[in-house]
């Protein structure tokens, strides 16, 4: 039994030492009252992929500017140049690289109402696709101005949904109002991409 006494004493001493440290630490926190701070000698890395309202408004503005740019390019340089620009706009603004985009254009008709593919979106904007013979090119209608009036914006994490009116004016000054819903997703590079786009003409009784 004598062989175990030194080990017991060492264990007891270690326990007492640890307890003492714990007591000191607790006393230190207690003495500090409510003024408890956490510090670090290194800058803490933070990952924040939440979308801001300003990013949403900027993405909407960019869409409107792109539509006008396609129209003016068509008027000045023809369909080939307008189509090349439309392809760039779709690749830059929409999320087709992730998979199907929930795109329901204003003037699309059955059985090709929903344009879940890049090809379908391109056909709607600039036409010239035998798979979508009814498309004449919505973006080729000499649009000159786009005004966006949001009814509401719902932001949650890295997605944002908007609903409201978009007023598009052509070069003759004729304005067309559409009801529009967009949903944006912030990608791994911090860019907002459209993953839902529903557009329709206002109901008239």
Curated annotation (Swiss-Prot):
Cofactor annotation remark: Does not require a metal cofactor.
Coiled-coil ranges from the UniProt annotation: none
Record field: catalytic activity: hydrogencarbonate + H(+) = CO2 + H2O
Activity regulation, free text: Activity is not affected by EDTA or 2,6-pyridinedicarboxylic acid (PDA). Activity is not affected by addition of most divalent metal ions, except zinc ions which decrease the activity. Inhibited by the iodide ion.
EC nos: 4.2.1.1
Keyword entries, A-Z: Lyase, Signal
Signal peptide (residue range): 1-24
Annotated transmembrane regions: none
Keyword Ribosomal protein in annotation: no
Binding site for hydrogencarbonate: 106, 124
GO molecular function: lyase activity
SUPFAM superfamilies associated with the record: NTF2-like
Keyword flag Signal: yes
Family: Belongs to the iota-class carbonic anhydrase family.
Functional description taken from the UniProt entry: Catalyzes the hydration of carbon dioxide (CO2) to bicarbonate (HCO3(-)). Has only very low bicarbonate dehydration activity. May function even in metal-poor environments.
Description of how the protein assembles with itself and partners: Homotetramer; dimer of dimers.
Protein name according to UniProt: Metal-independent carbonic anhydrase
Source organism of the structure: Nostoc sp. (strain PCC 7120 / SAG 25.82 / UTEX 2576)
